[in-house]
Amino acid sequence: MNFAIAIDGPAAAGKGTIGRAMAAHFGFPHMDTGLLYRAVGRRVLSGMPALEAARALTPEDLQADGLRTAEVGQAASQVAALPQVRAALLDFQRAFAQRAGGAILDGRDIGTVICPDAAVKLFVTASDDVRAQRRHAELISKGADLTLEAVLADLQARDARDMQRADAPLKPAEDAMVLDTSRLSIDEAVEKAIALATARMAAREFSPIRPN
C-alpha cells in the first residue's frame, strides 16, 4: 500500500528538517524537491538553458556542492516559475511519491500539484523574521558574509515570486494541516508533525514498517 506524505511551505520554515525526521521515524524514503530546482538553477547559472537543464537532470546533480547558496536559491526560484521546467520535473516527483510502502516529499506544490491525493498534507510555515534568523544562522555557519537584513529581503522576494507565479503557486492545499513553527523548537515541530501523520495513518489503518 502506498502512503504519501506531502509537506509544503516557504523557505526556512522547517519543512526539510521535519521531512527528514519523519522519514527516519516512519522508515519512508524522502525527497527534498527543492533540490531539483536548485540543481536546475545551478546548471542555468553555468550557462545551460533552463528546460535543457531540467531534462538533463540526474540523481548525481542532487549531490553537487553549492546547491544551498543564496545565489542558487534565487536561480531555483526563477526557474521554478517556468511552466515548462515544472512539467519536465513532474513525472520524476510523482514516480517517487508512488513508491510502495510510503514516501515523503517536501517542496512548494506537493499537496496541490504533485500529490493532490496524498494521505497526509502538511503546510509548514513561520514568521518572516524567524525564518530570516534561521536562514541567516545557517548561511553564516557555512562561511557566508550576509547581513540579516539582506537575508530577510531575499526570503521575502522569493516568497513573492513563489506565491505569485501563475503555475503551481505556493499555497496550502485546501485539506492541508497548517503547522506554524515560529515558536516551536525543532523537536517540538517534529513531534507535532509525526503526531498528525500517525493519526491519519490510524484513520486509514496503515502501519509503516519502521527501521530497526
From Swiss-Prot:
<dbReference type="GO" id="GO:0005524">
    <property type="term" value="F:ATP binding"/>
</dbReference>
<comment type="similarity">
    <text>Belongs to the cytidylate kinase family. Type 1 subfamily.</text>
</comment>
<dbReference type="GO" id="GO:0036431">
    <property type="term" value="F:dCMP kinase activity"/>
</dbReference>
<dbReference type="Pfam" id="PF02224">
    <property type="entry name" value="Cytidylate_kin"/>
</dbReference>
<keyword id="KW-0418">Kinase</keyword>
<keyword id="KW-0808">Transferase</keyword>
<dbReference type="GO" id="GO:0006220">
    <property type="term" value="P:pyrimidine nucleotide metabolic process"/>
</dbReference>
<keyword id="KW-0963">Cytoplasm</keyword>
<dbReference type="InterPro" id="IPR027417">
    <property type="entry name" value="P-loop_NTPase"/>
</dbReference>
<dbReference type="GO" id="GO:0036430">
    <property type="term" value="F:CMP kinase activity"/>
</dbReference>
<protein>
    <recommendedName>
        <fullName>Cytidylate kinase</fullName>
        <ecNumber>2.7.4.25</ecNumber>
    </recommendedName>
</protein>
<keyword id="KW-0067">ATP-binding</keyword>
<feature type="binding site">
    <location>
        <begin position="9"/>
        <end position="17"/>
    </location>
    <ligand>
        <name>ATP</name>
    </ligand>
</feature>
<dbReference type="GO" id="GO:0005737">
    <property type="term" value="C:cytoplasm"/>
</dbReference>
<dbReference type="InterPro" id="IPR011994">
    <property type="entry name" value="Cytidylate_kinase_dom"/>
</dbReference>
<keyword id="KW-0547">Nucleotide-binding</keyword>
<dbReference type="InterPro" id="IPR003136">
    <property type="entry name" value="Cytidylate_kin"/>
</dbReference>
